[in-house]
């Protein structure tokens, strides 16, 4: 189940999206209930995007948290927005009988965690992974004719912070050609 609740009193385009899902596998130990809520809030130049979800069953106890706070800079020609973010995907503790790794079986998995396809921080099928803790800073800038430049810095580690996966710098140029077509070119340093 999914609800889309507009919060126009906060700002145009603001909404929350609570959801409930019951996922069933043939093997009972992989089935779980998921409860969560996404929020996309805009107030003047301040932007907030967040999500929290829990997966729960007899053996599964996992969660995810995503917080992004941004500033939309309408008064500058060259700067579009600045955003700081934190993503925490719970990881499994092999010392317990419970499965604590959050499964992104139905989600974007690695899509929002930088561009580099680094194996250690993109494996979120199932519940036995180390999880992820990501800090990021992003700036979107007007660049050349009708193009945008995204500069993003990411810091990745396991959920418990014991395994450092590394840092990433993204430089991405995007140009909208029409309503149906855009091009994207980028460099990624890991």
Q: Model segments located where?
A:
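Residue-level signature of outer-membrane beta-barrel architecture
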Residues: 3-11, 41-43, 54, 71-75, ...
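Transmembrane beta-strands of outer-membrane beta-barrel pores
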Residues: 20-26, 43, 52-56, 73, ...
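Residues that define the transmembrane beta-barrel architecture of outer-membrane proteins
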Residues: 1, 31-35, 42-44, 61-65, ...
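Internal metal/ion-chelating core segments
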Residues: 1-50
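Solvent-exposed loop/turn segments connecting transmembrane beta-strands
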Residues: 24-31, 55-61, 129, 159-165
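Repeated loop/turn-to-beta-strand initiation elements of outer-membrane beta-barrel proteins
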Residues: 8-17, 45-49, 76-82, 145-151, ...
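Extracellular/periplasmic loop regions
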Residues: 47, 51-52, 60-142, 148-150
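C-terminal amphipathic "assembly/sorting" segment characterized by alternating charged
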Residues: 134-190
């Amino acid at each position: 189940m999914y609800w889309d609740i507009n919060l126009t009193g906060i700002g145009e385009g603001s909404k929350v999206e609570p959801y409930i899902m019951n996922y069933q596998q043939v093997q009972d130990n992989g089935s779980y209930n998921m409860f969560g809520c996404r929020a996309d809030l805009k107030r003047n130049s301040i932007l907030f995007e967040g999500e929290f979800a829990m997966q729960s069953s007899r053996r599964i106890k996992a969660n995810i948290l995503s917080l992004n706070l941004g500033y939309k800079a309408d008064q500058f020609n060259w700067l579009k927005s600045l955003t700081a973010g934190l993503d925490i995907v719970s990881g499994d503790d092999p010392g317990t009988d419970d499965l604590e790794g959050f499964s992104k079986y139905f989600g974007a998995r690695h899509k929002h965690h930088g561009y580099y396809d680094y194996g250690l921080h993109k494996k979120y099928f199932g519940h036995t992974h180390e999880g992820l803790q990501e800090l990021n800073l992003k700036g979107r800038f007007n660049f050349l004719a009708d193009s945008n430049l995204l500069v993003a810095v990411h810091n990745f580690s396991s959920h418990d912070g014991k395994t450092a996966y590394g840092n990433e710098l993204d430089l991405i140029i995007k140009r909208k050609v029409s309503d149906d077509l855009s091009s994207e070119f980028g460099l990624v340093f890991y």
